[in-house]
A protein has these predicted regions:
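Short acidic helix/loop segment immediately C-terminal to the autophosphorylated histidine
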Residues: 39-46
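Short alpha-helical segment of the dimerization/phosphotransfer core of two-component systems
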Residues: 57-62
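Conserved micro-motifs of the catalytic ATP-binding
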Residues: 77-82, 115, 119-125
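A conserved beta-strand-to-alpha-helix junction within the catalytic ATP-binding
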Residues: 83-101, 152-153
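Short conserved segments within the C-terminal catalytic ATPase subdomain
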Residues: 103-113
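Short conserved segment of the HATPase_c
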Residues: 170-184
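Conserved glycine-rich
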Residues: 211-212
Length: 230
């Protein structure tokens, strides 16, 4: 590793550490604040369930964030071996869609899955990280009563996964940045949806682990399509 590469790596490490500290502080501050109010009997008895629910919600957000940070750190370690097995990507995508169906229903988003039974030699853990974050992102950032199309196919002998939504779209100037760690186009919307800012970064890491690449096609107020080539 030359000096320039070492400096870049060190800068990225420091930025990541600073972002992690900031992201962890937000839910921890909320949990501490709500708990302190309850401890000092400053919450009316009838409001206790509401405050307890807020603490639980922030705790879940914190746990999700910590898990995503661990995943990113593991994917950064090029020496970690994840194992391989033949996976039917279409069936795997259906499993993930089924798990995310309650979220889709809560947001009135219709998810449609189509494509071919494509076999791929890969880690189930990494394929779960790939599909889950792609599909979850398409649901979270969709419009109410929106649609999400998930397609699995094979192009030139390689798996191709497309996730297309009817969301608000991503401005051109941000399209190259949405896979960066903790980058959010709309921070207020991300807070409402509970996003950690690491989902698409995890997708990028998984795709790069398998030597693939990602395309993004987006139009404002029409939607976004993310295409993964493995």
């Amino acid at each position: 590793m030359d000096i320039t590469e070492r400096e870049r790596t060190e800068r990225m490490r420091k930025e990541f550490s600073a972002n992690v500290s900031h992201e962890l502080k937000t839910p921890l501050t909320s949990i501490s604040g709500f708990a302190e109010l309850m401890e000092n009997h400053l919450v009316a008895p009838e409001d206790v369930p509401e405050f307890a629910a807020k603490i639980h919600r922030e705790s879940e957000r914190l746990l999700t964030l910590v898990n995503d940070i661990i995943k990113v750190s593991q994917l950064d370690d090029k020496e970690v071996y994840y194992g391989k097995e033949n996976i039917d990507l279409l069936s795997f995508a259906k499993e993930v869609c089924d798990r995310l169906e309650p979220m889709a229903q809560s947001r009135n988003v219709t998810v449609e899955l189509s494509g071919d039974a494509v076999l791929y030699l890969a880690s189930r853990q990494l394929m779960n990280d790939l599909f889950y974050n792609l599909i979850e992102n398409g649901i979270k950032y969709n419009k109410p009563n929106g649609k999400l199309w998930v397609t699995v196919s094979e192009k030139k002998g390689h798996p191709c996964i497309s996730v297309k939504d009817t969301g608000i779209g991503v401005p051109m100037k941000y399209q190259s940045r949405i896979f960066e760690r903790f980058f959010r186009v709309d921070k207020s919307h991300s807070k409402q949806t509970g996003g950690t800012g690491l989902g698409l970064s995890i997708v990028k890491h998984v795709v790069e682990y398998y030597g693939g690449y990602i395309e993004i096609h987006s139009k404002m107020e029409e939607g976004t399509e993310i295409v993964v080539h493995l």
